Curated annotation (Swiss-Prot):
InterPro entries reported in the protein's UniProt record: Ig-like_fold, Ig_E-set, IPT_dom, NFAT, p53-like_TF_DNA-bd_sf, RHD_dimer, RHD_DNA_bind_dom, RHD_DNA_bind_dom_sf
Domain notes: Rel Similarity Domain (RSD) allows DNA-binding and cooperative interactions with AP1 factors.
Compositionally biased region (Polar residues): 226-253, 361-370, 724-733, 901-910, 938-952, 967-980
Primary subcellular site in the record, as a coarse category: cytoplasm
Summary of the function given for this chain in its UniProt record: Acts as a regulator of transcriptional activation. Binds to the TNFSF11/RANKL promoter region and promotes TNFSF11 transcription. Binding to the TNFSF11 promoter region is increased by high levels of Ca(2+) which induce NFATC3 expression and may lead to regulation of TNFSF11 expression in osteoblasts. Plays a role in promoting mesenteric arterial wall remodeling in response to the intermittent hypoxia-induced increase in EDN1 and ROCK signaling.
Keywords: Acetylation, Activator, Cytoplasm, Developmental protein, DNA-binding, Nucleus, Phosphoprotein, Repeat, Transcription, Transcription regulation, Ubl conjugation
Species for this entry: Mus musculus
Stretches for region Disordered: 18-37, 205-305, 358-389, 700-742, 862-886, 898-986, 1056-1075
Protein name: Nuclear factor of activated T-cells, cytoplasmic 3
Effect of a null allele: At 10.5 dpc, knockout embryos exhibit normal heart development. Adults show attenuated phenotype during calcineurin-induced cardiac hypertrophy compared to wild-type littermates. Reduced thymus and lymph node cellularity at 12 weeks of age. Decrease in expression of lipopolysaccharide-induced NOS2 expression. Loss of increase in mesentery arterial wall thickness in response to 7 days of intermittent hypoxia. Simultaneous knockout of NFATC3 and NFATC4 results in embryonic death soon after 10.5 dpc. Embryos appear normal at 9.5 dpc.
Signal peptide (UniProt feature, chain positions): none
Length: 1075
């Protein structure tokens, strides 16, 4: 912007500054170095400021002819230029004339403005090769192209007329100048020693071949400007003195002799001058004594010399890296507000574990943000300081509070004690650390600028008391620090620290130590005090929010995080030389006076769990409760957000003062099968909420009321069997064995869905039962009950769970007994089951009284209710009933039951075939479900014919079943036994109980069930039941294994232990396969 004539006796002529045109006169030939004052005549360039860069077509530098001696005239000029120029000339002074013979234009001082854009570095690299091919004779011929002002009219750039500050002049930014040394730069820093030591420590990491200053490239329009004038980049004000890959200075001209820089008139000019807030230019540290009106005197990350840039600035001139520092390297393309300056200590002293945090975005940086650290340091160390994001206070990445993983036992070496945020138990073995007296829920913390507000007090008066149980061998130290009280894991609080209280009233000795920048108070636990200590020496200190919030990685806000916990920790010596670490935290303590007066606080509540149906009354006690206070129940999802939120109904007429009575709302999912933990809090407004408390919803045991007589369908006068099928989904896939009513003379079919079984009944009293496991009360009115013992033989725990078939012998009307002492009732039967098993049960049958059975099962427990409103006469032949117990969508299957009771002896009993098929996997219960149950063997004539009832329950899928039990129960034995073939109805995914009988045996007027009888010797048709993958060989193997487990001796023992008033059958019937 200036043109000057550096005459020996003339002052600088700044005509072009005021828009005047004139050719500057050449300097006198006899001018000496002493005639040129450094402040009056520095190296001058001639610029044209008026036209924009796009309109510049010819350089305005005028060659100066008639220089008689370049040694006498240009030596001072070169000295001054090397002293003042930003980049300096590393060429040999002899090359001052162009190859054409004309003298080189005189290089005079100049003021140059440049703006930096993301393309600066790219454009600089693009023209690097142009300079590489230039020989020394042509370098000065092309260099006058830098004698032009490039001033892009960018909105963010300052007006040239408003910024005549010499801060951007080349003469004030020369790295040859003594003013750019670390000694002169340190004058602008408040902490000179720390900055220089930091720079020295970090710069030792650098490679001597890389440029610490970097060379952030040219400006957006600089490329066209260089193309028009064919200029090189050797005088670029942004180039580094070191030979970086982006620098134009080669090894030859760098090692060439260079005049020593003369004394500078501005040795103490600041180099860390702050950039203007609206400018995007990268001022490389002003060495001018005149400051711009905007910059702050304090060092700022917006200045070119910052604590970040010192990382790569050369400090030791003798290290072979650079003769002088070059601290300016960063160019930022966006405007940063002034308040977002980094106030924390230098983040370059990073731990090795944090090094890669800064280097993640290395490849995504724009060229203007890159420095030569990328070339050397960036490839050798993960430490990354070249990102301009580190210069400024950037938004921290989301910090995930992942809970630390503790070790298996809280035993540590004394040399590596656990960190303060490591979770530790409160007790281990016989040692326990406990807080006998909790602190008050509010304590006014004091600030750093005010006096102490005393020690933390207890709610009962006095001070908190901590005691160690289980260890009293020698004194140990109790460590105390201030921890967090939020929903996340316990860790040292960022905004509060413990404060040691001293005075005449303090009876407990203590001392302060620092552990990982957290103040910890050590209090002795003495055996003579029973390892107990009264914490009357600990206060709470509030740190400044601004100091903490601006720390890297800190995401908490001080004014919203005012609750703390007193955390106590001990390290108990162990015989092995290690220590046992225990830790306990107090209740939350509110440290803000405003929050303590405005925020509600829940101290206790009457209940902490209820069923998912809700409806229970809960009394909440606390402080700062208002009439409009609300209690909100919420459940958080996996993302931490509220998954379910509902307001509890507050019973206003019962509330008083600090007590609120509310009705617990029902849980949104009443079908849960396990306990669910939710939270609730009390709020007085949108921003006045208490701390969340935990609450547990427990699942409800489904209750199904038993039906009365009117619920049963009418029973005809004749024994008319009915086949009823009902299916109901159940929320549980529970144990089908667990609950079954003992029903002598019945075929039990217990499945998860509720089902209804009806049989013609005789004169029987009303029957009820109590299911202990389901919590249902069912009463049985019995006229006579006889408990018949039986023997349980465990077998293979493989296969589906099916209850077996039984028939008991009755003579006349009787009742169905049940063992009330058992919560899992079963009928005494010959019970054998296995995977895809075929259980063969031989049961003697006497006259049975048919009774209607109604069973409703709401939770897969099989509650049975039988009524006998009618007295009927049974025909000589009893038609067996077929039960279709569908269970298509269930995974837990139980065996069907058919309860057959006849009033008169049956002359002929048709074979009963039980063939439940279920292609899916079945889950069954534990063998403990087998208990001695009641039955009533009644004397009477034996049945002339009793055919064995084949029991087949193939299951195609793998089934988890209990160890099946073999039960054998018989009344009077029949004299003749026949074996029938296995036949079955094919109902996929259902449980089928098919009973075969002779339809002609029914009276003509009776209703019959359309069931097709199967031939007795017919082989089972596996294809019809969808079990194509099971072969007959598999079935034979299973049947053979089952048969081997049913021994005659066991059956004989069972029958011998059974009191039978009537004559016994001479033969014991055994089951066998039809194959």
């Amino acid at each position: 912007m200036t043109t000057a004539n550096c005459g020996a006796h003339d002052e600088l002529d700044f005509k072009l500054v005021f828009g005047e045109d004139g050719a500057p006169a050449p300097p006198p030939p006899g001018s000496r170095p002493a005639d040129l004052e450094p402040d009056d005549c520095a190296s001058i360039y001639i610029f044209n400021v008026d036209p924009p860069p796009s309109t510049l077509t010819t350089p305005l530098c005028l060659p100066h002819h008639g220089l008689p001696s370049h040694s006498s005239v240009l030596s001072p000029s070169f000295q001054l230029q090397s002293h003042k120029n930003y980049e300096g000339t590393c060429e040999i002074p002899e090359s001052k004339y162009s190859p054409l013979g004309g003298p080189k234009p005189f290089e005079c001082p100049s003021i140059q403005f440049t703006s930096i854009s993301p393309n600066c570095q790219q454009e600089l690299d693009a023209h690097e090769d142009d300079l590489q091919i230039n020989d020394p004779e042509r370098e000065f011929l092309e260099r006058p192209s830098r004698d032009h002002l490039y001033l892009p009219l960018e909105p963010s750039y300052r007006e040239s007329s408003l910024s005549p500050s010499p801060a951007s002049s080349i003469s004030s930014r020369s790295w040859f100048s003594d003013a750019s040394s670390c000694e002169s730069l340190s004058h602008i820093y408040d902490d000179v020693d720390s900055e220089l030591n930091e720079a020295a420590a970090r710069f030792t990491l650098g490679s001597p071949l890389t440029s610490p200053g970097g060379s952030p490239g040219g400006c957006p329009g600089e490329e066209s400007w260089h193309q028009q004038y064919g200029s090189g980049h050797s005088l670029s004000p942004r180039q580094s003195p070191c030979h970086s890959p982006r620098s134009s200075i080669t090894d030859e001209n760098w090692l060439s002799p260079r005049p020593a820089s003369g004394p500078s008139s501005r040795p103490t000019s600041p180099c860390g001058k702050r950039r203007h807030s609206s400018a995007e230019v990268c001022y490389a540290g002003s060495l001018s004594p005149h400051h711009s009106p905007v910059p702050s005197p304090g060092h700022s990350p917006r200045g070119s010399v910052t604590e970040d840039t010192w990382l790569t600035a050369p400090v030791h001139t003798g290290s072979g890296l650079s003769p002088a520092p070059f601290p300016f390297q960063y160019c930022v393309e966006t405007d940063i507000p002034l308040k977002t300056r980094k106030t924390s200590e230098d983040q370059a002293a990073i731990l090795p574990g944090k090094l890669e945090i800064c280097s993640d975005d290395q490849g995504n940086l724009s060229p203007s943000r890159e420095t030569s650290v990328d070339d050397g340091l960036g490839s050798q160390y993960p430490l990354k300081k070249d990102s301009s994001g580190d210069q400024f206070l950037s938004v921290p990445s989301p910090f995930t509070w992942s809970k630390p993983k503790p070790g298996h036992t809280p035993i540590f070496r004394t040399s590596s004690l656990p960190p303060l945020d490591w979770p530790l138990p409160t007790h281990f073995g016989q040692c326990e650390l406990k807080i006998e007296v909790q602190p008050k829920t509010h304590h006014r913390a004091h600030y750093e600028t005010e006096g102490s507000r005393g020690a933390v007090k207890a709610s009962t008066g006095g001070h908190p008391v901590v005691k160690l149980l289980g260890y009293s061998e020698k004194p140990i130290n109790l460590q105390m620090f201030i921890g967090t009280a939020d929903d996340r894991y316990l860790r040292p609080h960022a905004f509060y620290q413990v404060h040691r209280i001293t005075g005449k009233t303090v009876a407990t000795a203590s001392q302060e130590i620092i552990i990982a920048s957290t103040k910890v108070l050590e209090i002795p636990l003495l055996p003579e005090n029973n390892m107990s200590a009264s914490i009357d020496c600990a206060g709470i200190l509030k740190l400044r929010n601004s100091d903490i919030e601006l720390r890297k990685g800190e995401t908490d806000i001080g004014r919203k995080n005012t609750r703390v916990r007193l955390v106590f920790r001990v390290h108990i010596p162990q015989p092995s030389g290690k220590v046992l670490s225990l830790q306990i935290a107090s209740i939350p303590v509110e440290c803000s006076q405003r929050s303590a007066q405005e925020l509600p606080h829940i101290e206790k509540y009457s209940i902490n769990s209820c069923s998912v149906n809700g409806g229970h009354e809960m009394i909440v006690t606390g402080s700062n409760f208002l009439p409009e206070s609300k209690i909100i129940f919420l459940e958080k999802g996996q993302d931490g957000g509220p998954h379910w939120e509902v307001e509890g109904k507050i019973i206003r007429e019962k509330c008083q003062g600090a007590h609120i009575v509310l009705e617990v709302p029902p849980y949104h999912n009443p079908a849960v099968t396990s306990a669910v933990q939710v939270h609730f809090y009390l709020c007085n407004g949108k921003r006045k909420k208490s701390q969340s408390q935990r609450f547990t919803y427990t699942p409800v045991l489904m209750k199904q009321e038993q039906r009365e007589d009117t619920d049963l369908p009418s029973v005809p006068s004749l024994p008319v069997p009915h086949s009823a099928q009902a299916q109901r989904p159940s929320s549980e896939t529970g144990h089908p064995h667990d609950r079954a009513m003992s029903a002598p003379g019945g075929l039990l079919c217990q499945v998860q869905p509720a089902y209804t079984s009806m049989v013609a009944s005789t004169h029987l009293p009303q029957l009820q039962c109590r299911d202990e496991g389901a919590g249902k009360e069912q009463h049985i009115a019995t006229s006579s009950v006889m408990h018949q013992p039986f023997q349980v033989t465990p077998t293979s725990p493989i296969g589906s769970s099916y209850q077996s078939i039984q028939t008991s012998m009755y003579n006349g009307p009787t009742c169905l007994p049940v063992n009330p002492a058992s919560s899992q009732e079963f009928d005494p039967v010959l019970f054998q089951q296995d995977a895809a098993l075929s259980s063969l049960v031989n049961l003697g049958c006497q006259p049975l009284s048919p009774i209607p059975f109604h069973s409703s099962n709401s939770d897969a427990t099989g509650h049975l209710l039988a009524h006998s409103p009618h007295s009927v006469q049974t025909p000589p032949h009893l038609q067996s009933m077929g039960y279709h117990c569908s269970n298509a969508g269930q995974t837990a299957l139980s065996s069907p039951v058919a309860d057959q009771i006849t009033g008169q002896p049956s002359s002929h009993l048709q074979p009963i075939t039980y063939c439940p098929s279920h292609p899916g996997s079945a889950t069954a219960a534990s063998p403990a479900a087998s208990h001695p149950l009641a039955s009533s063997p009644i004397s009477g004539p034996s049945s002339p014919q009793l055919q064995p009832m084949p029991y087949q329950s193939p299951s195609s899928g793998t089934a988890s079943s209990p160890s099946p039990t073999t039960r054998m129960h018989s009344g009077q034995h029949s004299t003749q036994a026949q074996s029938t073939g296995q036949g079955g109805l094919s109902v996929p995914s259902s449980l089928v109980c098919h009973s075969l009988c002779d339809p002609a045996s029914f009276p003509p007027g009776g209703a019959t069930v359309s069931i097709k009888p199967e031939p007795e010797d017919q082989e089972p048709n596996f294809a019809t039941i969808g079990l194509q993958d099971i072969t007959l060989d598999d079935v034979n193997e299973i049947i053979g294994r089952d048969m081997s487990q049913i021994s005659v001796s066991q059956a004989t023992e069972v029958m011998r232990d059974t009191p039978l008033p009537g004559p016994a059958s001479p033969d014991l019937m055994t089951s066998h396969s039809a194959h």
